[in-house]
């Protein structure tokens, strides 16, 4: 089974990393692939370049065999759309390999506004991570999809290539990339919110309003 977890990762932090590991354990897979978007279609420009975000992810997952970096959206260029990414992966994996995309309830609540959203269940399973205080709108397309396709165990995702929904409620760290960027802009340290190597890169590159390290 091939599992992807997409996002801007601007910057990647311990909340992302812990969630990815929780998913790998819950789904009983050896690896979760982090897929940073190039230009997110539903957000403004990010604070770090695509190349910088890729490098920070490499630093963050170094030495962790359960996490891998998938650079396809960055290399493809342009706006990053989930349906395009899943089609590319389906072509690479073949028709029979179970493919899973991981998404939080906050992002999934607007599922019917995603480009070609109707095609996604035919390409992959969807794992919806329940976040505290974030519920799917009653009567929404997302809620209906969950009601129609939700299964009770991860083992069912292994039995077919696509089309099912699984809800997970793992313990989540209350860390956000937005909060980290604001903290840095205010002159506060992001240490212990994101890996030390990532903190060092943020300072070295002067990202998010950080004061660059002299001589770099």
UniProtKB/Swiss-Prot annotation:
Pathway: Cofactor biosynthesis; NAD(+) biosynthesis; deamido-NAD(+) from nicotinate D-ribonucleotide: step 1/1. It is an enzyme of class 2 (transferase). InterPro entries: Cyt_trans-like (IPR004821), NadD/NMNAT (IPR005248), Rossmann-like_a/b/a_fold (IPR014729). It catalyses: nicotinate beta-D-ribonucleotide + ATP + H(+) = deamido-NAD(+) + diphosphate. It comes from the Bacteria. Its EC number is 2.7.7.18. One of its GO terms (molecular function) is ATP binding. Signal peptide: none annotated. Keywords: ATP-binding, NAD, Nucleotide-binding, Nucleotidyltransferase, Pyridine nucleotide biosynthesis, Transferase. Belongs to the NadD family. Catalyzes the reversible adenylation of nicotinate mononucleotide (NaMN) to nicotinic acid adenine dinucleotide (NaAD). HAMAP family: NaMN_adenylyltr. This is Probable nicotinate-nucleotide adenylyltransferase. It comes from Marinobacter nauticus (strain ATCC 700491 / DSM 11845 / VT8) (Marinobacter aquaeolei).
């Amino acid at each position: 089974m091939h599992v992807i977890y997409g996002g801007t990762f601007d910057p990647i932090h311990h909340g992302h990393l812990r969630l990815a590991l929780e998913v790998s354990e819950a789904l009983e897979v050896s690896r979760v692939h982090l897929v940073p978007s190039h230009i997110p279609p539903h957000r403004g420009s990010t604070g770090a370049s695509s190349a910088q975000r890729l490098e920070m992810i490499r630093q963050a997952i170094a030495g962790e065999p359960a996490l891998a970096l998938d650079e396809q959206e960055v290399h493809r260029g342009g706006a990053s759309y989930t349906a395009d990414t899943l089609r590319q992966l389906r072509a690479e994996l073949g028709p029979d390999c179970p493919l899973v995309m991981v998404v939080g309830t906050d992002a999934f609540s607007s599922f019917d506004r995603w480009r070609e959203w109707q095609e996604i269940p035919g390409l992959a399973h969807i794992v919806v991570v329940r976040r505290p205080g974030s519920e799917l709108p009653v009567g929404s397309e997302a809620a209906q999809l969950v009601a129609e396709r939700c299964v009770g165990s991860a083992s069912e995702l292994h039995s077919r290539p696509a089309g099912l929904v699984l809800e997970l409620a793992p313990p989540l760290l209350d860390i956000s990339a937005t909060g980290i960027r604001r903290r840095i802009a205010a002159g506060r340290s992001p240490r212990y919110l994101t890996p030390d190597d990532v903190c060092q890169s943020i300072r070295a590159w002067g990202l998010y309003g950080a004061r660059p390290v002299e001589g770099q």
